[in-house]
Amino acid sequence: MMMSDLPHDLVEEILSRLPLISLKAMRSTCKTWNVLSKHRSFANKHIGNVTASGKRDLIMIKDCKVYSIGVNLHGIQNNNNIIDLSIKNKGILHLENLDLIFKEIFNVFHCNGLLLLYGSITDDSIRLVVCNPYWGKREWVKRINNFASFDKLAFGYDKSCGCHKILRVFDSYPNRLEIYNLRSNSRMVSSFPLKWDIAFMQDGVSLKGNTYWYAKDRRSEDCYLICFDFTRERFGPRLPLPQPFIDEFLGSLYVVREEKLAVLVKRWRGGKSEIDIWVTNKIEPDEVSWSKFLKVDNTPRFFLTEGYLIYDEEKVVVFFNKEETEGLKSTVHIAYIVGENGYFRRADLREPLYQPLCRLVCSYVPSSVK
């Protein structure tokens, strides 16, 4: 029996179980399947199956293309006790010739199935593009321009109207905010008295439609979290970190399964580093509680850590780093896999990381938003 002879409902059920990366091939294989895949009902069913599987895709930007990647935590151990940790490209997600538009992509933000890409285009100006990898569509953000080097961007979701918004915090005017509504294509500039600064070179992360940053009091230099609530269009109160920290010991914020926020803390004692990872029990714009996820003692110094991934079910964290080879002739890219009860492995990535991982890789959950 040919696939075309099967009942429509059965075909839909089979196709709705395909992985995200197979959408492009499915649409190009058969006109009927292409039409089916563009129905909202099919998209909702397909996305529901992807979400129910519990698997989370990682999106990586390489050479101005968007890839779906997978990480093999176990790898193959060689004679030198070094694991070959494979970072496998599952394939390119079709997104209307991004590589022909951008010269370089500086950052990527993910919120509710959409990606916000920030980079330089062919005339060297800085532009923003919003993409939905599920539909393979992109749209220019036309009314946000004239970026300064240290302006802060955030990507969020207004639950009251069901639309995505972009926030810009101006570096030159620290009390000035700009909010762009993607649905109405409207732009609003307002003043908001800020008594704190967003941590230098730290990007915010989107969780449940809101964005969280490290912030530091301008007088006391105390460090804490701050949240921008995109529904109420305002910053929330200061949220305490698990314990008092100095910001240079804090690693990047990380979102776990689109449900929790993780904080990494590094300390150095006697030539060795101690790493604590805390995960939220509860996280809202005006409330947070923490529990310790993992403590790692006596690990090498992670001076140049480029990013990390948390696998909460396996109780494992993967740290990405650079190491200079003997004689400082070249730099190799490696990863440390650490877990409970002293579990520690060094993994050889063999090929260079394409960009700093913490900036150009994010967890991705698809959305049917067009």
Curated annotation (Swiss-Prot):
Q: List the disulfide bonds.
A: none
Q: Which InterPro entries match?
A: F-box-assoc_dom_typ1 (IPR006527), F-box-assoc_interact_dom (IPR017451), F-box-like_dom_sf (IPR036047), F-box_dom (IPR001810), SCF_F-box_component (IPR050796)
Q: Known SMART domains for this protein?
A: FBOX
Start and end of every F-box domain?
1-45
Quote the protein name from its UniProt record.
F-box protein At3g20690
Record the organism. Answer: Arabidopsis thaliana (Mouse-ear cress)
